[in-house]
Amino acid sequence: MFRGSTQLNLDSKGRLAIPAKYRNELFANCGGNIVVTADPSRCLLIYPQPVWEPIEKKLSGFSSFNPQIRSLQRLIIGNACDVEMDGSGRILISAPLRQFAGLQKEVVLAGQGEKFELWDMAKWDLEIDTATACKDGDIPPELEGFSL
């Protein structure tokens, strides 16, 4: 289970050092085999390969005759990259994915349960500002009655 956010730096080659607290779990659960893909929010999604596979299968199974579904398939599956964590716990983020998400040197790795989101730090700050600006009436019906 991945939770919390960590401020990190991409190195000059576009590699991301996965925080030590997650490395053992990733090596144990997926042998360090990871999938990185684009998200419509202009961040990147990072999945352990076994978590990604049923998502890809389900998304691929939807009809591509629906233009919205086809666009999502192109974005998410079409940009998916298999990467392997090296012995130092680093993964290479491809140049096209870095460009898509606007990643500069300073990034935020945000745990989201079974996956991570990778954000440019400035975009992450804006995302958090937007989330904290929500009014009580803005809560989706699915969360009504949910208490923290």
Curated annotation (Swiss-Prot):
Q: Where is the SpoVT-AbrB domain?
A: 5-51, 80-123
Q: Quote a single Gene Ontology cellular component term.
A: nucleoid
Q: Where in the cell is it found?
A: Cytoplasm, Nucleoid
Q: Which Gene3D superfamilies match?
A: Transcriptional regulator MraZ domain
Listed under subunit, the entry gives: Forms oligomers.
The UniProt similarity line reads: Belongs to the MraZ family.
Q: What is this protein called?
A: Transcriptional regulator MraZ
**Which organism encodes this protein?**
Nitrosomonas eutropha (strain DSM 101675 / C91 / Nm57)
Identify the gene encoding this protein. mraZ
